[in-house]
Amino acid sequence: MSQSIHSTTKRNIFWFRRDLRLADNPALLAAIENCDELIAVYVLDEKIIKDSGAKRLAYLGQSLRALDESLGNKLHVIAGDHVEVLKKLIEKYGADEVHISQEYEPYGAARDSKVEASGIKIVKTGSPYAVAPGRVLKPSDQTP
């Protein structure tokens, strides 16, 4: 009797976006801590590709190659709609959750809301910034 490869192994997807750090990345650590296998993905955002110049795209390509090398050539770099790409990976690997860094910019927050609205379970941890917006308070009145 054959058993599904998805039944005993807990898999999470870590969706890299602007923050390609491996060290000191709270969202990546959270994704790793509660799974047996991590699937790393970078979805090539068609809007960003269209709006970027050659130098920015070359830098992104170099950065993704370096990240892939650091991950032992296990980074999935896929162009397409975020929801479709993530759903295909979830189905292919039987992943339970998609982990991300909390996004604060309007475009990224709207993108993440669209992914969540599609029924994909998103776990938001940390921030793509060294210090999350709103965490540093002015001494005079304790406002951000």
In which residue ranges do the predicted regions lie?
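Trp/Phe/Arg-rich N-terminal binding region typifying the photolyase-homology
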Residues: 2-144
